[in-house]
Amino acid sequence: MPINKSEKPESCDNVKVVVRCRPLNEREKSMCYRQAVSVDEMRGTITVHKTDSSNEPPKTFTFDTVFGPESKQLDVYNLTARPIIDSVLEGYNGTIFAYGQTGTGKTFTMEGVRAVPGLRGVIPNSFAHIFGHIAKAEGDTRFLVRVSYLEIYNEEVRDLLGKDQTQRLEVKERPDVGVYIKDLSAYVVNNADDMDRIMTLGHKNRSVGATNMNEHSSRSHAIFTITIECSEKGVDGNMHVRMGKLHLVDLAGSERQAKTGATGQRLKEATKINLSLSTLGNVISALVDGKSTHVPYRNSKLTRLLQDSLGGNSKTMMCANIGPADYNYDETISTLRYANRAKNIKNKARINEDPKDALLRQFQKEIEELKKKLEEGEEVSGSDISGSEEDDEEGELGEDGEKKKKRRDQAGKKKVSPDKMVEMQAKIDEERKALETKLDMEEEERNKARAELERREKDLLKAQQEHQSLLEKLSALEKKVIVGGVDLLAKAEEQEKLLEESNMELEERRRRAEQLRKELEEKEQERLDIEEKYTSLQEEAQGKTKKLKKVWTMLMAAKSEMADLQQEHQREIEGLLENIRQLSRELRLQMLIIDNFIPQDYQEMIENYVHWNEDIGEWQLKCVAYTGNNMRKQTPVPDKKERDPFEVDLSHVYLAYTEESLRQSLMKLERPRTSKGKARPKMGRRKRSAKPETVIDSLLQ
């Protein structure tokens, strides 16, 4: 969105990364898996232990915020999502997405259990937050809120709110708008309940399946987008519009076929999911690595749509979800490494002011025009009011005849207010009564006057209908525009209250945690100072030995980290090779079909006339409208009455020496008949030929 950079400078922020660890589920407990993850919420660290190797030191990662298994949904929302949504309400773009292995609680974090207020996720809580802010705004502030919901299934973008959820949508890009989805449906909402209903509708259409690791595994990436336009009066007295977009992303989880047991369609879905997540990892790596000159956004639909969210015009928060069980050690370490890299991505967010396509401004302009029309009245022809005064001027032509006609047309349009309509109706009724009383009026004049009254009455009725239509249109537009300060919470009021109470409690806990952290640092510093003061050589030797052990532990941890990185790199290579092998099998099958059904010459012709469409990810034929059935030659239907002079009659010719063919040929040989009205000449009768059956038998013998 174009803005004045001198007035609104860009704010450079890193992507905020938080980590949430779920508790052990019933399946993991029944199979006696051990917990390998420990969470220190005060220090913001995640420590992962390798339970089958006691010699290997644990790995520790530090993030902005971490949440343990006992964390509450409201705490997660207030600490992570609330700052992003506050920025969106100020006019920034914001993105919140959950990332991690399948079955780690990404969908629970983003959606939660909407029927229970305390278990609602980020998306439902954001509804109450947004409309709570609108309800507290000043009275002269106007808001327009729109929502859309899409999914990326097998690298196909689908509209979850559209009539046909299987229709593929195209990803487009414009310099003034950025990346957008063509023909994606968006709905205007007036309260949090509307948002919740729309989300429920879209969630029912989302692709979900069962695997060995998750009974309700998401088989697609889903993006719920909320667009908030705000119009308020500035210091200059003019109305200023700003627009913020909030993308709430629920990613499908990365999978290993050996653990999920995916086969058939589920395996194909998993391959596409892993490919898109691998591209997301490559984008993160390219953004963090200062040497990379190319960021592969276009390699996947997911990264293409998140282009602004990763390294662009957006404030972004990433929630990495992990599982605590030791059998997911490799996946947990991989997720934490990706999240640790994402911390270094820098975004340049700016307020989107005065967008050219701001829908709120268009609505306000239409409302003002409609109000003006209603105040001044509808435009009707002046002949409707003044009768037939212009009849005398018809046919007035001359050098300036055209100008006079224009003047009459302009002067003939007058404004009729609702009060004037009532007066006109009364006047028409009076004239009708007067017409009925004048019995001595000639029949022709009476019919003419009656026709004039009927015409004027129709025009008046039309004006009243247009007036009513304008009122209805104005009412519909005013319903779409939400006025600040009006109580819009209804059922969401309780949820907003819960959020505020939880936020206050979190602030108090944060203050106490900061105080305890400072005290802990002071104690550690005092301990180090005491250790430095040696009273004898023996104590000094013990101190040096202790430091040497610490350094040795750090060295072993670094070696272990390097070995893990090599193993992870090897696993990624194996996964990519498996994907390549799968794609190679599909390619060989396609080539086999092509080689057996399409001649070589036509293959070369097709290859010369196809091109790759980046927007939809397909090969397309050039000038396809002029090929194939579209240009099939229309052969004229021959007239049965006309006979081709070169056509040879072969009806009496048989093509095989069978009993049936001989019988048909002999039966067709008939004597010529005379025309009607003429007697057959009397001649000597010829000897009758033998019956066809006899001839056939003799021929066959």
Swiss-Prot record:
- Which parts of the sequence are annotated with region: Disordered? 373-423, 665-701
Residue span, Kinesin motor domain? 14-345
Q: Where is this region: Globular?
A: 599-701
Coiled-coil annotated residue ranges, if any = 355-592
- Locate the residues binding ATP: G100, Q101, T102, G103, T104, G105, K106, T107
Quote the PROSITE patterns the UniProt record gives: KINESIN_MOTOR_1, KINESIN_MOTOR_2
Q: Where is this region: Interaction with DCTN1?
A: 365-701
Q: Where in the cell is it found?
A: Cytoplasm, Cytoskeleton; Cell projection, Cilium; Cytoplasm, Cytoskeleton, Microtubule organizing center, Centrosome, Centriole
Q: What does this protein do?
A: Microtubule-based anterograde translocator for membranous organelles. Plus end-directed microtubule sliding activity in vitro. Plays a role in primary cilia formation. Plays a role in centriole cohesion and subdistal appendage organization and function. Regulates the formation of the subdistal appendage via recruitment of DCTN1 to the centriole. Also required for ciliary basal feet formation and microtubule anchoring to mother centriole.
Protein name, UniProt field: Kinesin-like protein KIF3A
Which gene holds the coding sequence for this protein? Kif3a
